[in-house]
Amino acid sequence: MAQFVREFKEEDYQDVLHIWDKTDMGGEHRGDDLKIIEDTINFGGKLFVLEDDDHGIIGTSWITNDQRRLYLHHFGILPDYQGKGLSHILMEKCMEFAMDEGLQIKLEVQRTNHTAKALYKKYGFKYLGDYDIYIVRNPEDINLDNL
């Protein structure tokens, strides 16, 4: 059983959605559809997939690029493959991409995900301090009348 990282191809889309569903990372219900993936890739990002020779795609890492920094998200591995050190294969590819681009790389992680936080720290990520992140996921929820 050998694993390797490669770039996303359109025919990977359903497998990627399956991983995102099984790892609670997102999917079409959060706007993570094929068009958005392709747009972010065309704008200098990458979607890497971790593939197993015997079992197909088992992990993903999506990197978007705003031309100032890279954003690492949707980094995850199917539960049956977690705890086997496979995240290092995927993370090394991400960090190589950041070095090649010469851009800083940033990510968000749930406070309770201690395993992921330990991995990120091993690769040099630093905690930025106590600040909260807010988002409006649905533009229809924007209400300027209350201002």
For each predicted feature, which ranges?
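Conserved N-terminal entry element of GNAT/NAT acetyltransferase domains
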Residues: 1-11, 140-147
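Acetyl-CoA-dependent GNAT
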Residues: 3, 7-74, 78, 91-92, ...
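Short loop segments at secondary-structure junctions
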Residues: 52-55, 80-81, 137-141
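Conserved acetyl-CoA-binding loop-helix of GNAT-fold acetyltransferases
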Residues: 77, 83-96, 118, 122
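Conserved GNAT acetyl-CoA-binding A-motif
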Residues: 98-109
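Conserved beta-strand-loop-alpha-helix junction that forms the acyl-donor binding cleft
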Residues: 107-117, 135-139
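Terminal substrate-recognition subdomain of acyl/acetyltransferases
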Residues: 122, 126, 133-147
